Structures are given as structure tokens and as C-alpha cells.
């Protein structure tokens, strides 16, 4: 499971530290890893608490939490086969659970689940590009996702006319994938390939825009017509 934030850096570090404590506490009590949804719920409540009192200020971040939850039915009392059918109390035997999870948590503590999310500078451009991918269909492979994520980041930076930047990426696969369900940095060779793809795609978009501009009639031509 991984987390990223935009906004005040110290607040982001505290958010990650608290998330680690919540995950550790969950494992101590329930003897199983915390799910992405439960961690988002707990962290949303934690951020919301800082909006209730005048003695503390709200968090100055928007955070994204992503993870891959086990799809196996763990034989833990209160987790499988018994307990309520909804909420944190348990699962229903035979029903499928787990898989990928992605949540964005706002400073108010409000959080939502997404197929793809973006925050920070350039988020509107990134969101527009994410919508083009039809992530809900679930047809994007892990390697394709890395390439598209790199492309979107390059597009967002180019739109804002940002200076040169260093791209860092992490990923999470299922238990059969390259990360075995763990949150890890994308290997250097795959990251370099993704950056080449992103730069090539960006150059292609620039060429298309230049071609469209060349096809447009000049103002003088329009007046003569």
C-alpha cells in the first residue's frame, strides 16, 4: 500500500507516519493487513478531526492512497463467515473481495474511491487525460498503466510550462505480479522506457497541433473571401 500527497510537505510526512501507525494497529488487533478502504476511512476521520477544534489547524494536503487487497478469504474470526455483512466487522463467505483500491482524501477528511485520481498543480489536465483511458473497463495492463501515467505527468507539466523535472514512480501489482502485492519503486529500465514513450507521445501531440495551425487560413485570407 502506498500514499502520496500534494500541499504542505511536513503535513504530508505526518500523514504518512499516521497511516503507518493505523496499519500497524489494525494488524495487531485483527491479525491481518488493513484494507485500502479501511485505511482511507481511518485517515479521513483523522484529517476531519483537525477541522473540529480552534486549537489546531486543518491539514494543508490532499492525499491519495492506493493498494492491492488480498482476494483470498482469510480464516479469521469476524472476518469470514460471521459478523455483519457490511462495515468493518466482516466478510460474507463466497463473496469476492479485495483487488485494487484507490482513494483520494481531502483536507476536510472527505474521501472518495476512484479508478484514477490526480492532485496538485496540473490536476485538471491530468484528470482530463485519465478520463480518456476508460479505466473502469479494466483493460489496461500494469506496464501500459506505467507508460500512460508517465505520459499524463509529462502532459500536465508541459501544459503548465514547468521547468525540467525528475520523474519518480511506484507501483503495486497483485500477488502473481512483479511486486507480489507490495508497494515498490518502478524498476529503472521500465521507468526509462515509460519516459521515452511519454516524450514521444508529447512530441506527436505537438506536431499535430502545429499541423492544425498551418491548415488554418490567415486573417487576411478570411477578409478577402
Model-inferred region functions:
Residues 1-225:
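Long, low-complexity N-terminal extensions
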Amino acid at each position: 500500500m502506498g500514499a502520496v500527497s500534494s500541499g504542505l510537505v511536513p503535513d504530508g510526512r505526518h500523514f504518512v507516519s499516521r497511516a503507518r501507525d493505523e496499519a500497524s494497529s489494525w494488524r495487531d488487533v485483527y491479525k491481518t493487513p488493513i484494507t485500502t478502504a479501511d485505511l482511507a476511512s481511518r485517515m479521513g476521520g483523522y484529517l476531519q478531526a483537525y477541522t473540529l477544534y480552534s486549537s489546531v489547524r486543518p491539514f494543508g494536503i490532499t492525499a491519495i492512497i492506493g493498494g492491492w487487497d488480498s482476494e483470498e478469504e482469510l480464516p479469521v474470526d469476524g472476518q469470514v463467515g460471521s459478523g455483519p455483512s457490511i462495515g468493518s466487522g466482516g466478510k460474507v463467505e463466497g463473496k469476492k473481495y479485495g483487488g485494487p483500491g484507490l482513494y483520494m482524501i481531502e483536507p476536510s477528511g472527505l474521501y472518495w474511491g476512484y479508478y484514477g485520481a490526480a492532485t496538485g498543480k496540473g490536476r485538471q489536465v491530468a484528470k482530463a487525460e485519465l478520463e480518456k483511458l476508460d479505466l473502469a473497463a479494466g483493460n489496461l495492463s500494469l506496464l501500459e498503466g506505467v507508460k500512460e501515467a508517465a505520459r499524463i505527468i509529462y502532459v500536465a507539466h508541459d501544459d503548465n510550462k514547468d521547468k525540467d523535472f525528475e520523474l519518480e514512480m511506484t507501483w503495486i501489482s497483485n500477488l502473481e505480479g512483479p511486486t507480489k502485492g507490495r508497494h515498490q519503486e518502478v524498476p529503472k529500465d521500465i521507468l526509462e522506457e515509460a519516459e521515452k514513450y511519454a516524450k514521444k507521445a508529447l512530441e506527436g501531440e505537438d506536431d499535430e497541433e502545429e499541423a492544425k495551425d498551418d491548415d488554418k487560413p490567415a486573417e487576411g485570407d478570411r477578409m478577402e473571401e
